[in-house]
Amino acid sequence: PPRSTLDRSSAASDVYKRQVEGFGYELSATRVGSAYDPGVGYVQRTGFTRIGDRIFKGWTAPSESSTLRHLLSMNGYLFLRNEDRSLESAEIGPEWKIDAKSGAVLTLTAKAIYEDLPYSFKLSESAHVPVGSYSFHDLSASYRLPISNMVRLTAKGSAGSFYDGSRLSLGLSPGWSISKHLEFTGNYQYERIRFPDRAENFDSHIARLRVETALTPKLSAIAFIQYNSAVDRVISNFRIRFNPKEGSDLYIVYNELLNTERYRHMPNMPLRDNRTLLIKYSYTFTLGG
C-alpha cells in the first residue's frame, strides 16, 4: 500500500542545559516512520517514537577530599510503536560518576529494563529468547585509571536478570603507550547468560588486540585482531598508510577471517573464510585561481 510522507520521514528535537555544577538536563524526542530510508547508512529500528534522556546534578568535592567532582543522574528512555502507541522498550535508573583528583573515574549504575518482543531471537544455536514481555534489572560498575598514565586500565562488570534468565558480564580494557611511536590497546569481554527454566546457557569470550605505530610522521601502521568464541572465529586487519606529502596518501590494507573450530558443521569449514588485500592511492588536486 502507498506510504504517507510521515511514514517515510524522520524528525528529532532536543532541549538541554549542560553544566558542571548544579542541576541540568538533556531531553530529546525522535520519531522515525515505518518506511523511513536514511539513504546513506542504516537505522536499527523503524516505526517508533523515542523519548529520553536524563536529568542530573553535579557538584565539586571539598578541597580535602581525594575526589574532585561528582555527577548524579537519572537516565531513561522509552520506545513507543507508532502503529498502536504500545510500549516496545524502556529503561530507567540512576548513575553516579565520581572523578578523582588523580584522574581515575568510578561509575556506578542501576537499571530497570522492559522489553516487549514480537519475535524471538537467538543468542547461539543452543540459547534463545522467546516471544513475550519482560521486565528485568541490571547493576554495573566501571573503574578507569588515569588516561594520562603510560599504562592504563578500565575494568567493567555488571550483573542482574536478563529477560527470563540471568546475566553476568565482565570486561577489561588495558592500554600501554610505550612511546610516541608505539601503543598497545586490548579488550577482553566475558558474557555468562543462563536460562534455568529452559535449561539453556550462553557463554562468550571476546578478545581484541590493537597495535598502532608511527615510525615517522609520514609512515604509520595499525594491526587489529579479534577472537570471538561464540562464532569460533578470528578476524584480523592490518593497515599501512604512507603520506609522502600533503594531499597524497597510499593505503595497503589486509583482512583475513579464520575459523578456529572447523569441524563443528558438516561439511567441514575451511580454515580461511575470507582474505582480501586492498591497495588504495589518493591524490588531492589543487586548482589555481
Predicted regions and their residues:
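Transmembrane beta-strands of outer-membrane beta-barrel pores
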Residues: 29-35, 57-59, 76-82, 112-116, ...
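Single conserved hydrophobic/aromatic residue that forms the stacking wall/gate
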Residues: 1-12, 16
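Outer-membrane beta-barrel "beta-signal"
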Residues: 238-254, 259, 268-289
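Short loop/turn motifs that connect adjacent beta-strands in outer-membrane beta-barrel proteins
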Residues: 17-24, 60-71, 100-105, 150, ...
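Residues that define the transmembrane beta-barrel architecture of outer-membrane proteins
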Residues: 47-51, 88-92, 135-139, 166-168, ...
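Outer-membrane beta-barrel translocator domains and adjoining extracellular loop/strand segments
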Residues: 10-13, 37-42, 83-90, 118-125, ...
